[in-house]
């Protein structure tokens, strides 16, 4: 799959980041992860991101990274495209991008570099080097210490033909408006804020109709129902789900730092697709929070 084909795929539909399965010792559980992907693939996501943020990319060793990507590619071959997370220091991101391409992934999501702040010139060089190291498509993840301004994005679209996507987690509506209006369809735009469904309507109005759904990990039927309602401007359905499910979900998520990932794994366990514990420095939900989440999920009915 070339970069343009990937761009077309991520320009429409719902995207999701499967959690990464660990056993009770905290080791990668390949068979459980493969079963998870087999369960999720038929629900209709346009692409799945292996080893993304929700997949605890930040905690994987080099060997585990390769095993996660290979398992995802092999399991989903012919059914749904796999986009790999890649990031950290520039040379590490290049190594991971090359490895993902070698293993048959269809592109990468370029995750933020680690810890240090960087100038726009430094970020441009970082993205350029990663893009130049591979042939397949690269999606830039605009978040945390890794945020590009409009001028930098323009320069990179001219330098890097295989830079095909821009995922925004900044929530800066004015900036996203400027980007979509100036860059146009040179890039595909993805909403990337936590619990993205709550922000999906305003992002759609900006020309960013696609987003990644974390809750697809445990309520794929409802996640697709929400996306299809959003797509058809069925505000009655989207408003009902936001009020009755997503806003209460956010209240649980915000009880502790790191719950944005821990809560997703807990949800998967509640619906019968246990992915094991999260790895430190994340912590699993408390029993009380787990029970509150289970009660909320139960209101949606079978998935």
Swiss-Prot record:
Enzyme kind, highest EC tier: lyase
SUPFAM superfamilies noted in UniProt: Aldolase
Record bears the keyword Lyase: yes
Listed GO biological process terms: D-glucarate catabolic process
Pathway membership, UniProt: Carbohydrate acid metabolism; D-glucarate degradation; 2,5-dioxopentanoate from D-glucarate: step 2/2
Record's catalysed reaction(s): 5-dehydro-4-deoxy-D-glucarate + H(+) = 2,5-dioxopentanoate + CO2 + H2O
UniProt entry keywords in alphabetical sequence: Lyase
Molecular function in Gene Ontology: 4-hydroxy-tetrahydrodipicolinate synthase activity; 5-dehydro-4-deoxyglucarate dehydratase activity
Enzyme Commission code: 4.2.1.41
Assigned protein family: Belongs to the DapA family.
Protein name, per record: Probable 5-dehydro-4-deoxyglucarate dehydratase
